[in-house]
């Protein structure tokens, strides 16, 4: 007589707890400090394992922290995907970037016309959106082509790296320019303005006016610009370095965006292009990696193919899914988990939970979690829905503030939400797969370059919990492998839905 399956093939819920990493209890571990009886029991009482969510396991450079974009992409693809940062580094190492025909043409043209090259991007080594060392290759290429006027429009971080480190990173930018023999920092502005992605054009326009028209507070050095901020590196006000002279983007100049990730720079890129066009300035614009801008901006490095993932398999099988998240993570359960495809496929329903006004995550760590939870519970009760995919954003989004107390509250709110979702799953006979997409809240401090320990709101290289809650309790619970990666999630989901993994997937079902 055969042993009954511990999980019956049928409808389920994929629950991504953003920023849910695993680490030993510590004074800066918000997850261990928080009262989270549901999450604790989830891991202790149900089949669980730890999944690698950073570095080579997900298509990043070794030792690189995970992030929400690559996390959701790999969850959806069922295989590691070479991420843009890795592809850029490979292009640098092979010499392909330096010899790229488009880069060659842009630099030749601007050199021949005595125009200026404007390099715009985030200056840190957080490796989430950019890496300051990529400037070395771009500056060297400009020097080789004898481009005499190279202006760096520096965006300070304070989010993917420890706050109050902007001065050190701008010092590194100056060192790279000196080593290349060309380039100088012309403007400085915080990422809170230059990298808004929520459609707050009032913020973006400050960055546009700074770069295009030189409108900002005068500063005698990059360091003094950083010191002028009362809100840390993320909110350094628009600053024009007087020593750089006139560094406005002029007709015939070239602009090279060196962020490798699109989502937080594309709003700036689109608005700058529109502003320059409206003012009669023709500018040759190119990006280091591929952007999803309205404006067609040629890229030096193309992104990896992510087809053949979970979305394709669900559509081919005729299965219906509902995707639910609030605005901050909506693209992750739609665009990114679908392989950076914005198409709403047959059988997909997208539910975006929007907030009101500008978010203060420290003051409101619950965000819109109650409404997200209600939407998940409602979708779980529908008989026409095979798979609910939801992202609970609080642990990560509030964790990014670096505020330990607020992040503890966010963890506890998430715990209560998971309790409601698990109850809805039991009521509707659904299995649940709960997984983090990367670490964050389990480490809330970091040693700064000067040796001090400072609040840290960035991601980590820690593995993430992966838990399967079966849809039946009358059989022994299965045991999961001791190791896993995010690439195993999609094959496991398809197995639980009664389907085989797609041929493009290299991950394996964990049951």
From Swiss-Prot:
It comes from the Bacteria. Mn(2+) 1 binds at residues 396, 400, 459. One of its GO terms (molecular function) is manganese ion binding. Keywords: Glycolysis, Isomerase, Manganese, Metal-binding. The active site is at 68 (phosphoserine intermediate). Belongs to the BPG-independent phosphoglycerate mutase family. Pfam families: iPGM_N, Metalloenzyme. HAMAP family: GpmI. It catalyses: (2R)-2-phosphoglycerate = (2R)-3-phosphoglycerate. Binds 2 manganese ions per subunit. One of its GO terms (biological process) is glucose catabolic process. Residues 442-464 are annotated as: Disordered. Monomer. This is 2,3-bisphosphoglycerate-independent phosphoglycerate mutase. One of its GO terms (cellular component) is cytosol. Its cofactor is Mn(2+).
């Amino acid at each position: 007589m055969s042993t009954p399956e511990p999980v019956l093939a049928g409808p389920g819920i994929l629950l991504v707890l953003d920023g849910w990493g695993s680490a030993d209890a510590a004074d800066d571990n918000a997850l261990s400090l928080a009262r989270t009886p549901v999450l604790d029991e989830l891991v202790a009482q149900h089949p669980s394992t730890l999944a690698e969510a950073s570095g080579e396991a997900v298509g990043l450079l070794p030792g690189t922290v995970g992030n929400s974009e690559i996390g959701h992409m790999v969850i959806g693809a069922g295989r590691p995907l070479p991420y843009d940062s890795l592809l850029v580094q490979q292009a640098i190492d092979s010499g392909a970037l330096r010899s790229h025909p488009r880069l060659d043409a842009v630099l030749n043209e601007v050199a021949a016309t005595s125009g200026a090259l404007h390099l715009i991007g985030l200056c840190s080594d957080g490796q989430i959106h950019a890496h300051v060392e990529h400037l070395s290759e771009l500056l060297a290429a400009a020097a080789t082509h004898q481009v005499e006027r190279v202006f760096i429009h520096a965006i300070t971080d304070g989010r993917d790296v420890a706050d109050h480190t902007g001065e050190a990173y701008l010092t590194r930018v100056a060192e790279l320019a000196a080593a290349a023999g060309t380039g100088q920092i012309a403007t400085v502005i915080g990422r809170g303005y230059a990298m808004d992605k929520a459609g707050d054009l009032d913020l973006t326009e400050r960055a546009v006016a700074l770069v295009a028209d030189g409108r900002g507070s005068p500063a005698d050095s990059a360091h003094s610009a950083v010191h002028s901020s009362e809100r840390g590196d993320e909110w350094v006000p628009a600053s024009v370095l007087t020593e750089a002279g006139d560094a406005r983007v002029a007709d015939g100049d070239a602009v090279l965006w060196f962020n490798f990730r699109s989502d937080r720079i594309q709003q700036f890129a689109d608005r700058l292009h529109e502003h320059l066009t409206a003012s009669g300035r023709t500018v040759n614009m190119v990006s280091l990696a591929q952007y999803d801008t309205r404006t067609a901006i040629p890229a030096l490095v193309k992104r990896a193919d992510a087809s053949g993932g979970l979305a394709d398999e669900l559509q081919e099988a005729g299965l219906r899914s509902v995707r639910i998240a609030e605005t901050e993570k909506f693209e992750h359960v739609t665009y990114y988990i679908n392989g950076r495809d914005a198409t709403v496929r047959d059988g997909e329903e997208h539910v975006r939970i929007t907030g009101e006004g500008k978010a203060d995550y420290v003051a409101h760590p619950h965000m819109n979690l109650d409404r997200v939870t209600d939407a998940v519970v409602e979708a779980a009760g529908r008989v026409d829905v095979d798979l609910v995919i939801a992202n609970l954003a609080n642990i990560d989004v509030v964790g990014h503030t670096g505020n330990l107390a607020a992040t503890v509250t966010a963890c506890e709110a998430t715990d209560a939400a998971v309790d409601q979702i698990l109850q809805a799953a039991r009521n509707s006979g659904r299995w649940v797969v709960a997984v983090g997409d990367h670490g964050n809240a389990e480490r809330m401090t970091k040693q700064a370059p000067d040796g001090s320990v400072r609040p840290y709101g960035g991601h980590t290289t820690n593995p993430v919990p992966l838990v399967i809650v079966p849809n039946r309790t009358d059989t022994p619970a299965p045991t999961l492998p001791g190791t896993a990666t995010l690439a195993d999630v999609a094959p496991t989901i398809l197995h639980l839905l009664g389907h085989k993994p797609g041929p493009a997937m290299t991950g394996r079902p964990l049951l």
